[in-house]
Swiss-Prot record:
This is Ankyrin repeat domain-containing protein 45. It comes from Mus musculus. Pfam families: Ank_2. ANK repeats lie at residues 75-104, 108-137. GO terms for biological process: cell population proliferation.
Length: 248
């Protein structure tokens, strides 16, 4: 199911997920016949051609390469959205090297991740997540990319984004637990040396587990999350308990 006419009446949302052909036509119309020179290499996945434009000072479009890349159509889409619609993950990876903001959103809050999710471009989603885009970004409906994928019945994309979210949750808990040690104000009280060591070791082991298990299932990830919480929670509870000292 392609997200073409199933969106609601807001014209900008319809246009955001219009067909690749319509995207090209809109670009040509806006440029009054002068097509954006980055459009074709973006849509065809010509990474070498794009790199030449960005890296060869002698190329006629080199000086304005970033400006051309970020040039928006009437609904606020630049060529990165075209790459997402076309499923050109290699193009996204290549263009990311030139300092573009992969989290930038249209006026209605649609990010590249939302776009790739709506179109069912699984490999593009994977590339964007690998590049650390914000998977929690919300559009004007309050939808994450995962919700948009579900709306268009992009099952593989939903499953992948659920998996990416599970990894993010574990990373956040690791970070929060580490902050108890590195930033004492984040904790509820004074931390004993042995407890500090316990938390540090647990966080280190969970980070190592994440790095060494890139294909871990959602249930395995949540099992690791639970293990970490089972270690940290009793320590936090102990820190929160008032200490009573015997009178001398």
């Amino acid at each position: 199911m392609e997200p073409e006419e199933t969106l609601e009446s807001e014209s900008s949302e319809k246009s955001l997920f219009s067909s690749q052909q319509e995207y090209e036509e809109s670009q040509e119309a806006e440029e009054t016949g002068a097509e954006n020179p980055l459009l074709q290499p973006t849509l065809t996945g010509d990474v070498e051609g794009l790199q030449k434009i960005f890296e060869d000072p002698e190329h006629p479009h080199h000086e304005h390469a970033v400006q051309l890349l970020l040039e928006e159509d009437i609904v606020g889409r630049n060529l990165l959205y075209a790459a997402c619609m076309a499923g050109k993950s290699d193009v996204i990876k290549a263009l990311a090297k030139y300092g573009v903001n992969l989290n930038e959103a249209t006026a209605r809050g649609y990010t590249l991740l939302h776009c790739a999710a709506a179109w069912g471009r699984l490999e593009t989603l994977k590339a964007l997540v690998e590049l650390d885009v914000d998977i929690e970004a919300l559009n004007f409906r309050g939808e994450k990319a995962r919700d948009v994928a579900a709306r268009y019945s992009q099952v593989e994309c939903v499953n992948f984004l659920d998996w990416a979210d599970a990894r993010l949750i574990l990373k956040k808990i690791i970070t929060k637990s580490s902050l108890i040690i590195t930033d004492p104000e984040k904790g509820p009280g004074k931390l004993f040396k042995e407890d500090k060591s316990t938390i540090l070791n647990a966080c280190r082991l969970k980070n190592e587990w994440l790095e060494s298990h890139p294909e871990a299932s959602i249930s395995e990830i949540f099992e690791q999350k639970q293990q970490l919480e089972d270690i940290v929670s009793p320590i936090l509870a102990k820190m929160s308990t008032p200490r009573h000292f015997a009178a001398s």
